[in-house]
Regions:
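Short, well-formed alpha-helical segments that are part of the catalytic scaffolds
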Residues: 11-26
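Short aromatic/hydrophobic "clamp" motif used to bind/position activated sugar donors
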Residues: 91
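Conserved donor NDP-sugar-binding/catalytic core segment of glycosyltransferases
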Residues: 103-135
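Short, flexible, basic/aromatic active-site loop/helix in glycosyltransferases
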Residues: 123-124, 138-156
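Catalytic beta-strand/loop signature of glycosyltransferases that borders the donor
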Residues: 124, 198-205
Length: 272
């Protein structure tokens, strides 16, 4: 029923990567398959973790596929590559430094059985810095397709690391694309404008690590340029009209140019 799709690259922390894989093995119900894409050449520490978990997943009768890309291609293209090796009907996303709560797969299977018409669903997330629960900070998102469509005009309406999607639906809209920092957001827009059904479960099933200069990567003119490119893509699809684009961009022009300390305060306020 479920393939887990994950990407790892050389700058990922081996210990965090190990925690992510361990959280999958600790599930109350195991996934059927795990597909790991190595986005470029890795270091020995990461390769050692992969070797360890090749054995562990095999001993639990979970197929573990490792696909290695010769050069780093970015998250969107890495996931697109890996999706072709997922052999189950549903693809569950997982980041290489986050922690899936023990019942994530079990709850996902239950939701699939109860909602066969939903093409993509996600959950809430709880963010942490050093250990789960240390920030007491959550990101909850709209539950219904209509709410997701409306909320998506302002902010990303899904937590990418929490989603589970029908493989057929993903392929129907052209899969992931290389839309830097917006690979997931753009995918949701493509699905929404093509009348696929999205939903969110109103509980947290993933603990998300927010270190690694998360704030620093979300500021500056370079990031702002990517925001404009994303908006133009959404306009091309008919999701944003002129007013939508203006309302989306105005606060971001201001926010992306803030110093780190103020940007961090804004980020925390948005979560609260």
């Amino acid at each position: 029923m479920i393939s887990v799709l994950m990407s790892v690259y050389v700058k990922d922390h081996p210990g965090h990567f190990q925690e992510a894989l361990s959280s999958l093995l600790s599930q109350t119900e195991l996934p059927n398959q795990v597909v790991l894409v190595c986005d470029g050449v890795l270091n020995d520490e990461l390769d050692n973790v992969i070797e360890e978990y090749l054995y562990k997943f095999s001993s639990h009768h979970v197929e573990f596929i490792v696909e290695r890309l010769k050069i780093n291609q970015g998250l969107g293209l890495a996931l697109k590559h890996g999706s072709h090796f997922c052999n189950q009907e549903y693809i569950l996303r997982m980041d290489s430094d986050d922690i899936s709560r023990r019942d994530r797969v079990e709850v996902s299977k239950r939701f699939i059985n109860d909602n066969p018409d939903i093409d993509v669903f996600g959950t809430g997330i709880e963010e942490f810095e050093y250990h789960p629960g240390d920030l007491n900070r959550y990101r909850m998102v709209p539950k219904t397709n209509a709410g997701i469509y409306s909320y998506g005009k302002k902010r990303n309406p899904m937590n990418h690391v929490s989603v589970c999607m029908k493989k057929a639906s993903l392929f129907s809209v052209g899969n992931y694309e290389s839309v830097i920092y917006h690979e997931d957001y753009y995918l949701w827009v493509k699905l929404l404008v093509n009348n696929f059904k999205l939903a969110n479960i109103n509980e947290c099933l993933v603990d998300v690590r927010v270190g690694n200069d998360l704030i620093g990567r979300r500021k500056g003119l370079a990031y702002l340029k990517l925001e404009f490119e994303f908006v133009n893509r959404c306009r091309d699809l008919g999701y944003f009209n002129v007013l939508d684009a203006i309302y989306y961009l105005i606060p971001r022009v201001f926010i992306r140019l803030l110093p780190d300390t103020l940007l961090n305060s804004v980020y925390k306020k948005l979560r609260d």
